[in-house]
């Protein structure tokens, strides 16, 4: 499944945040605005779908996530998304969402009060068919292709219909239900890359093609090189383009003698690895390779981010987040860095956060969402109008400024006319 758009409301300081994803979508705002909250809100929304009923209840009671701004008190959490799903060679557009009441006062129990699922074939003239329709007191689903969305289904106050329908194998849209429950994103924080350079001796079981992740970078790179040599070559080529002082990326495995009776119990989710992996780089002018952990934090972080993008392409990940990539390389490389991210991420959406005028200047305004406070402390994000995109660039040039410099000068000026460039509603 490929994520096309999301909507988040009532999460931390976020209000009515609607993002339609481009290949690369960038959230731009001043420091400490709420950019990371958008990433957390997306992650929360999908994690909630996958969580158990008990975990859902805990998530709905998390005081760190409940809106605390005086303008948002009592606001429900809403999560909606639009995804594209390929089924039997045909593309379907899927709209799914839910709403719940937070446990924001003592004695109040959290409750899911709304849920919907709509699907249509992505062809001209097709209309959405409603497959799930839920309110606070009733829940319906469509039980047959020719029927209506009128079959009653009983669900608990902290249970989603889309979860319960996983057991209904006979449904004609069962594959869509399965895909919705299994959609994968990677919103992990990349700001600290050093820990990824360590190799763990205890790993999660089932470390196969589908579960490649960045929990252990040397092991990920070893598996990538072994199972997807073309992807490893692509990663290495992209990295050396940005850091030409490096000649080679080297990963080694050191076999361990782990006897069967020294393994963890059979039903444990972890096991001792049979090898320890180490990552090295060969730098021009040096006789011997150096351990990856000894190079600069920025260079490590860029490698981590590029690996994350490559892994997404072999792990069927729909969306990945990159926080402040401008902290990793000097400004002269911003353009090349963005180009490489775009090339490597084909088939996977990327959402970026940035507060760097110079980095933003290298972006296409059509993929930028600007963070604005219309009410004190409430974070909203707005895209540029089509006419505003060209006007922004032209106005920046007329002032002898880069586009990003002009944009941030308006963000810092409460009297600026920035709303003239944005798709601004009149709320």
Regions found by a protein language model. Name each.
Residues 40-109:
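Conserved P-loop NTP-binding catalytic core
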Residues 7, 116-117, 184, 247-250, ...:
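Residues embedded in well-ordered beta-strands within globular domains across many folds
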Residues 10, 81-89, 119-121, 281-285:
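Short acidic, glycine-rich loop/turn motifs
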Residues 90-122, 143, 257-280, 376-385:
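Short, well-ordered strand-loop elements centered on a beta-strand within folded domains, enriched
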Residues 1-54, 271-427:
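Switch/communication elements of ASCE P-loop NTPase nucleotide-binding domains
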Residues 215-292, 402, 410-412, 416-417, ...:
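Extended helical coiled-coil dimerization/tether regions that scaffold
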Residues 95-247:
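Electropositive, glycine-dotted interaction segments
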Residues 20, 91-99, 123-138, 142, ...:
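Short amphipathic beta-strand/extended segments with alternating polar/hydrophobic composition
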């Amino acid at each position: 499944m490929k994520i096309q758009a999301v909507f988040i409301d009532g999460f931390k300081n976020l209000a009515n945040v609607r993002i339609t994803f481009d290949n690369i979508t960038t959230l731009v705002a001043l420091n400490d605005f709420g950019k990371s909250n958008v990433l957390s809100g997306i992650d929360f929304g999908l994690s909630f779908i996958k969580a158990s009923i008990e975990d859902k209840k805990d998530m709905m009671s998390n005081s760190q996530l409940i809106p605390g701004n005086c303008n948002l008190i009592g606001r429900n959490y809403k999560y909606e998304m639009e995804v594209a799903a390929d089924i039997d060679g045909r593309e379907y557009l899927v709209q799914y969402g839910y709403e719940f009441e937070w446990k924001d006062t003592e004695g109040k129990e959290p409750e899911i009060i709304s849920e919907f699922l709509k699907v249509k074939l992505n062809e001209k003239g097709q209309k959405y068919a409603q497959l799930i329709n839920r309110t606070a007191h009733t829940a319906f689903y469509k039980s047959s292709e020719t029927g209506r969305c009128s079959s009653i289904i009983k669900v608990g106050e902290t249970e989603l219909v889309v979860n319960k329908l996983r057991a209904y194998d006979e449904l004609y849209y069962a594959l869509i239900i399965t895909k919705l429950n299994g959609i994968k994103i990677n919103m992990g924080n990349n700001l600290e890359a050093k820990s990824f350079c360590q190799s763990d001796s205890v790993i999660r079981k089932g470390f196969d093609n589908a579960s490649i992740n960045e929990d252990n970078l040397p092991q990920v790179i070893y598996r990538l090189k072994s199972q997807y040599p073309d992807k490893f070559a692509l990663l290495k080529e992209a990295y050396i383009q940005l850091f030409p002082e490096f000649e080679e990326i080297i990963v080694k495995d050191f076999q361990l003698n782990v006897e069967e009776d020294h393994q963890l119990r059979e039903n444990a989710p972890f096991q001792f690895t049979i090898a320890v992996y180490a990552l090295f780089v060969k730098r021009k002018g040096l006789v011997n390779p150096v351990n990856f952990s000894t190079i600069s934090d920025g260079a490590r972080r860029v490698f981590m981010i590029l690996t994350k993008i490559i892994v997404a392409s072999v792990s069927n990940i729909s969306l990945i987040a990159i926080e402040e990539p401008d902290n990793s390389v000097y400004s002269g490389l911003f353009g090349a860095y963005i180009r490489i991210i775009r090339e490597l991420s084909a088939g996977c959406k990327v959402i970026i956060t940035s507060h760097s005028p110079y980095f933003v200047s290298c972006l296409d305004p059509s993929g930028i969402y600007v963070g604005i406070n219309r009410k004190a402390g409430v974070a909203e994000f707005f895209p540029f109008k089509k006419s505003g995109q060209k006007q922004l660039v032209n106005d920046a040039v007329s002032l002898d400024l880069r586009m990003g410099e002009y944009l941030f000068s308006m963000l810092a000026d409460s009297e600026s006319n920035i709303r003239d460039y944005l798709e601004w509603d009149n709320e």
